[in-house]
Design a protein with these regions (language model features):
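Solvent-exposed interaction surfaces and binding hotspots enriched for charged
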Residues: 1-196
């Protein structure tokens, strides 16, 4: 199982390396990886049929509940757990972003057309692009784990890999400022649903 996981992670790294030119800049690339981690948390929760609630805001449905929160926040390999470990290994003398505050901010702004991730962009406008990338990589993601609970982990490990690359190429100062946006985008996109 672990060997399959490593091979599929390698295929995902190849995909992102080959398609990196389609990302306008390095920061957007990292934030996109965060979005994919968030969406993988939702996909796992839906397919594992963990508890969830569809909430309507601004005429759209959004995905809330314990199921997605389990993969985002609570499991031993949750997105936040892995991101916190990464942050602490890279920035020992800095505090990890207040993810509870970020999560509350996201929850209170779901569906707000004027909301911007870290003041940069509206996630609703980026969602179709994130779905396209998700659909491009979904077969590889499925092969990475025979259980959906592994999907958020493999994508978070891909993000971890590219954080290492980013750190080496551009330094820690830029990366540390990206952490809140990566987390915020993951949280927001974990709530979004592909509408028919």
């Amino acid at each position: 199982m672990e060997n399959i996981f490593i091979v599929q992670k390698s295929f995902l790294l190849d995909y992102f390396n080959e398609n990196s030119s389609s990302f306008p800049d390095k920061k957007e690339f990292m934030i996109t990886l965060g979005a994919l981690c968030g969406y993988a948390c939702q996909a796992a929760a839906r397919l594992e049929q963990k508890g969830y609630l569809l909430v309507k805001a601004a005429g759209k449905n959004y995905f809330f509940g314990d199921g997605v929160n389990y993969y985002l926040l609570e499991s031993s390999n949750s997105f936040i757990t892995l991101m916190k470990k990464k942050f602490e290994s890279m920035f020992k003398n800095n505090d990890f972003p207040d993810f509870v505050k970020i999560l509350k901010n996201v929850a209170s702004n779901i569906g707000n057309k004027n909301y911007k991730i870290n003041g940069l962009f509206n996630p609703e406008e980026k969602f179709p692009y994130y779905l396209k990338v998700w659909n491009d990589i979904f077969d590889i993601v499925k092969k990475s784990s025979n259980k959906p609970e592994g999907w958020p982990v493999v994508l978070t490990l891909v993000l971890d890999h590219f954080m290492n690359v980013f750190f080496v190429c551009f330094g820690g100062k830029e990366l540390i400022t990206l952490f809140p946006a990566i987390i915020e985008n993951a949280f927001y996109i974990s709530k979004m649903i592909e509408e028919d």
